[in-house]
C-alpha cells in the first residue's frame, strides 16, 4: 500500500515490521493514497 509523507511529500511504501515513519525525513504522519479509480453511483 502506498502512503505519502505529510512533511516531505514523498511516496513511501511501508514494510511489515519497519514501523510507521518516513525513511527520508523521519516524520511519523503518513497519508494514505487514494485509488485513482472513479466510482459512479446511480441515484434514483
UniProtKB/Swiss-Prot annotation:
Its EC number is 2.7.7.6. GO terms for cellular component: cytoplasm; DNA-directed RNA polymerase complex. The keyword Oxidoreductase does not apply. It is found in: Cytoplasm. It catalyses: RNA(n) + a ribonucleoside 5'-triphosphate = RNA(n+1) + diphosphate. It comes from the Archaea. Binds 1 zinc ion. One of its GO terms (biological process) is DNA-templated transcription. The keyword Transferase applies. GO terms for molecular function: DNA binding; DNA-directed RNA polymerase activity; zinc ion binding. It holds the Pfam family Zn_ribbon_RPAB4. DNA-dependent RNA polymerase (RNAP) catalyzes the transcription of DNA into RNA using the four ribonucleoside triphosphates as substrates. NCBIfam families: PRK00398.1-3 (NF001606). Belongs to the archaeal Rpo12/eukaryotic RPC10 RNA polymerase subunit family. This is DNA-directed RNA polymerase subunit Rpo12. It comes from Haloarcula marismortui (strain ATCC 43049 / DSM 3752 / JCM 8966 / VKM B-1809) (Halobacterium marismortui). The gene is rpo12.
